[in-house]
């Protein structure tokens, strides 16, 4: 039988905010019920307008770029920390380019706020926190892929990244607690704190 299985995986502490599931749920409904499924850009345009009230009709296309732009992922970070399997690394340049792409997307997301109705603007906050976390993971990937020297400059940069991760975790925990109970939050905190400690070691 033909059908659609629409899932929201909770691996590695389920780091994603619940709001991020909305577009996937709409995709699932459209693919299940529509006799003619719009092309990707068109369905994203429709969702932007109908679900978010985005008069520019571009928001969901911007969001769609996020998940394909990072190279050192949360799954990579968890697997490498827990040593469950070998995690191959890209070059420092690949991670640097990924961080730059994510910064550009963050700028587009900030710009998109002006096209949203007031009641929808607050939803962008969760995406901005997620993007910042992804950018920091690319910087972590650069450290892991780079020369592990302990000169003063490198040490200072590593300590600065550790501090950025901890500040990000503070914001992330506040966001988590605004919609969820503690649940798996301690696992996410453990991963971030372990890497922060490692960066300072």
Summary of predicted features, one role per range:
Residues 1-201:
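Substrate-binding groove of N-acetylhexosamine-processing glycoside hydrolases
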């Amino acid at each position: 039988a033909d059908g659609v299985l629409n899932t929201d995986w909770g691996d590695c502490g389920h780091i994603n905010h619940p709001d991020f599931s909305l577009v996937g749920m709409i995709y699932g409904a459209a693919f299940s019920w529509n006799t003619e499924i719009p092309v990707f850009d068109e369905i994203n345009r429709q969702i932007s307008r109908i679900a978010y009230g985005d008069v520019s009709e571009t928001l969901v296309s911007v969001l769609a770029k996020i998940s394909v732009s990072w190279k050192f992922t949360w799954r990579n970070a968890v697997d490498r920390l827990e040593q469950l399997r070998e995690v191959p690394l890209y070059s420092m340049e690949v991670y640097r380019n990924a961080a730059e792409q994510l910064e550009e997307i963050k700028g587009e997301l900030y710009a998109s706020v002006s096209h949203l109705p007031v009641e929808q603007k607050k939803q962008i906050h969760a995406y901005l926190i997620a993007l910042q976390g992804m950018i920091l993971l690319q910087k972590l990937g650069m450290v892991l892929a780079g020369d592990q020297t302990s000169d003063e400059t490198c040490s200072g940069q590593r300590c600065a990244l550790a501090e950025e991760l901890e500040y990000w975790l503070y914001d992330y925990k506040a966001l988590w607690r605004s919609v969820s109970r503690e649940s798996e939050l301690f696992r996410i905190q453990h991963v971030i704190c372990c890497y922060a400690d490692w960066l300072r070691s």
